[in-house]
């Protein structure tokens, strides 16, 4: 089971059912109560996840969630609302943890003028002459496992161009158990202050994990993933991912590499974060 997909295994399904024995009441009432107060729109804005081990076939998983922080009321380009951070523990049926996460959401009331403006706005595809696309080649990763002896701090990862299509946005949301309408219904997304449907954080997480994992090799293992989201990924755009080695650590059980990465589209920076991977040299 890919670590970046960890969160989806215990999410509510389309019938609003949780993984057995998971948190099924508070703290989710926080979001419900904010909705009744008029703050009904929600976007995820950051992840900070630690992956302790891989999941295996036949394991059953669950989660416990605790709200750890609610900000004062904030005014953003999307509207007015609150940043809510939850701490999630992911465990197997025998209570053994396999991951934990801090996830921050913005629960907000969309600015009326922003929603009206977005009903007449369409995303603009990045032009071929964009500085973001210059210097890119058609070369594909060879998926070869990288050894730490071949790496140096400052090494740059190859750029990767990812077309942002309706199929990727909608398919990614459904594949990750995220049935929130803003990811497949343009009218609802515009009412929430967005120009169009937009990519959910789980799809972005998967793309980021794929980017660093393909570079490090098939036998590498993602141990930590942290990032913030900014400009949305909208249909018709492209995202260019870049990365740089920022730390190398030799431990008795693993050789670790930390990569700082970004993903930029025509609106600006979509994702900025870092990932730590255990390379394949030690088992």
Residue ranges of predicted features:
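Generic structural signal for residues positioned in beta-strands
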Residues: 5-6, 48, 102, 171, ...
